[in-house]
Swiss-Prot record:
Keywords: Nucleus. Residues 179-199, 222-235 have a biased composition (Low complexity). It comes from Triticum aestivum (Wheat). Belongs to the Ninja family. One of its GO terms (cellular component) is nucleus. It holds the Pfam family TDBD. This is Ninja-family protein 2. It is found in: Nucleus. The gene is AFP-B1. Transmembrane segments: none annotated. Residues 156-166 have a biased composition (Polar residues). Residues 99-108 have a biased composition (Basic and acidic residues). GO terms for biological process: negative regulation of DNA-templated transcription; signal transduction. Residues 1-29, 72-236 are annotated as: Disordered.
Amino acid sequence: MASRDFLGRFGGEKGSSSDKAGGGAGEPDEVVELSLGLSLGGCFGANSGRDAKKPRLVRSSSLAAMYSLPGTSDDLAAATPPPAPLMRTSSLPTETEEERWRRREMQSLKRLQAKRKRLERRTSMNSGKSGGSSSRDDAQEPLYPSAFQLRRSVVDQGNTSSSMPEQGSADGAEAKSTSSMEISSDNNNNNNASNQNKSLPPPAPSPAGKLPNGIVKEQPPLRTLRSLTMRTTSTGDLRKSMMEDMPMVSSKVDGPNGKKIDGFLYKYRKGEEVRIVCVCHGNFLTPAEFVKHAGGGDVTNPLRHIVVNPAPSVFL
């Protein structure tokens, strides 16, 4: 008790002396609390007396709506804003969900139908190609066994006729005559069969490679001397036809600036404008431009200054 009174008296005396000094100087007094009493917020807490009118510092807190200093209900109501109303969550209506599921089911059904149609079309195409190739092979197969069977029958008949035992002179003569007649008939049949095979066209060679899905891979035709000669003749005919369609022309211009320019008449259709390709530059020119290019200038009738050469030119 004595220590508390002493501290309080010491603090009171200090405060009174400071008040007196402050009053004499005319400056605002600041009372420093030296007591050991606990307060809210330390020296910045709630002070009684003249400091109660000063603005108080709010103690920091983790919650924004709670303050360290208690206040009146009116102050709290004015300071804290009213909470915003919570929006209630709601799911989509059942009708829209059903429509969405129904639309997805229709799309999946359409995709399955399209996939099934593609598979059916592919299988039908593969079966048609395999059936055509098998029928072609069946049509080509009978050509070989027929000739082979004929030759085998002739050989067998010759062997049987040569291995027959002789039974007397008369029987041997009859056997020889019959065997000779059979051999001659067999030879005739063999000749007829060979003639028929020669008259028939040769079978098409079997394709060398087949793809896994049954498609036959066509081989490029072999180049022969006949094909090369036909190619040369065809190129010659093509050149002649090209010369007939696009003849060579040349300019005929008189004057100091006139010069001879070769070109060829470009193929044109009915209703189109005539075009001439000059050999020197390869430009497509009209008759007037062609004559002007040769140095003739502007002329009224440019076709009179152009000569057609039926003979082929050196440039072709």
